[in-house]
Amino acid sequence: MKFFKHFVIAIVLAVTTSCTLDKTDFEAEINRDVTEYFEFKEVTSFNSDNYKISIEALNGTFYKGYNEIRLTITNTQTNEALNNSEVTFLPILTDSDNNKISCPHRYHLVYNSEEQFYSGYVVFTSISNPMENWDLYISFTGSNQTHTFSQLVTVQNQTNMNLNMTSFTGNDGEQYFIALVAPQKPKVAENELVAGIYKYNQPTEPAGTFPDPSQFSYAEVENYTLLLDPRMPEPSMGNHSSPNNVDLTQQADGLYYGVVNYTMTGNWTLNFMMLNQNGVLIKGTEVPTDFTPGIEGAKSELHINILF
């Protein structure tokens, strides 16, 4: 019995030491401070037909994943802002074979009368590279005329893993996208988790004159539920989870809100099961709750990895 007790204690110490060493080495390897961005700065500006168009985003940068945007239009002859116009916004990715696709976005921008800008969002699905370029196609009405133009922009890689995204085909055959919006910098605590969920609208008519928005249409998924099961997948963590998590549901702004409880820093996997408005499973698998020390944790077929 005495030998057995010493044996158990030795095993516990070995697992604890291994966990601590792995975690320490892991943190030393990444050595990355996560920066939170709160200030909107200009990403790009350009002039067309006596108007100046300026587009702002957090940190003045477009990243792969979710980007909130603010657009202003100024008449360069009168120096007056163009207010409450109908402004459309369409991002298009062109590859080396001239194939063109888009990504989730708000096509009709919404005018903010208090701060006098047009608001929207874009979820870039890839970064700019020598083989692929992103262009923004924008139109608006000013001086009783419709003005249209395009602007080449650069999309950078998102180094903050707390803002990762994923795309997938659901069990219903539709193409979906989930993009994390917040928190940018989680704490060891219960954190409000915010995500956007979008679906590609398959065209029902032949393409018209390019860029035909009906061929590049996306919708905010409505009244779905994103079941949440966070785990620490590192082998030393033994499939560790946490209590008090809250599944994500849609709120008035169209985004999905829940709660994720991070009990320690490190590598986490947000395992999801997505249900439609009728409770039908669209994507995701249940993750076993077994304690598995020394084995990498299982993941849902629908998941996003984060790190803090």
Protein language model features and the residues they cover:
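Surface-exposed beta-loop interaction hotspot
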Residues: I127-V194
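Short amphipathic beta-strand segments in non-cytosolic proteins
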Residues: F89-P104, A219-V246
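Short, surface-exposed loop/turn segments at beta-strand-coil junctions that are enriched for proline
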Residues: V123-P130, N261-N267, L307
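Aromatic sugar-binding surface patches on proteins
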Residues: V110-V123, E132, T249-V259
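Beta-strand-rich structural segments
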Residues: K64-Q77, A189-D212
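Acidic/polar, low-complexity intrinsically disordered N-terminal segments immediately downstream
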Residues: T20-K100, R106
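C-terminal motif of bacterial Sec signal peptides marking the signal peptidase cleavage site
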Residues: V15-S18
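Short acidic/polar inter-strand loop motif in beta-rich domains
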Residues: T78, N129, F140-T148, N267, ...
